[in-house]
Amino acid sequence: RIDHYLGKETVQNLMAVRFGNVLFEPLWNNHYVDHIQITVAETVGVEGRGSYYDQAGAMRDMVQNHLMQLLCLIAMEAPARFDADAVRDEKLKVIRALEPVEPHHIARGQYDGGGDLPSYREDVDNPRSFTESFVALKCRIANWRWAGVPFYLRTGKRMTTRSSEIAVVFQDLGHSIFEGDETRHRNILSIRLQPNEGIDLQVTIKEPGPGGMRLIDVPLDMTFADALDGNGEDVPDAYERLIMDVIRGNQTLF
């Protein structure tokens, strides 16, 4: 089965960021990571897919495929080599290590109508529907690397903004040497899948100007379009990339 999310350039860069940089891999564990958020928010509604969507819901439509694939790429161990079997084996280890999700760690909801926009029940033409168009859940992975680190997954339709992002939130220092600084500053690695594909690293710096050491958090921003200086314009989209892989017999992204 093909998951088109895996064809996105930024999703493929997850493995490059993790396993191609000495900076991140030593910190990629429960000693340094506080929690991880995976968000896929859409501004559209079910848009003519009501008969299908009302049977599936957000959990089956998004979580069990797209979000789980992202979770696996974030949490997996380094494969012995970069090929389909080795990558798939490491993903399966993550799936097998997932703890059962407790009912009180799941939130479900539907979008309501407003203005010219219909409600979910109007979109699916089912006034009694209880199928979720939004779902959020807290997952845990029972292995040495991730024990105690919560993974927060959420996805929904008719949200305020369209955004797909993974945020790796690192632990705070626990103690500040700077007098008067009571903010619990955290480094956050944000990987934007859409729109404006790119990577941000939030770091803490001194606020410019006199008056002592006032600290602020600022992003080190890398947007692919800017970093490639136009050289990424001809990069194939997710579906094109996966179709090419099918033709070439490359199953790494399947």
Where are these regions (language model features)?
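Secretory/organelle targeting and membrane-embedding segments
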Residues: 1-254
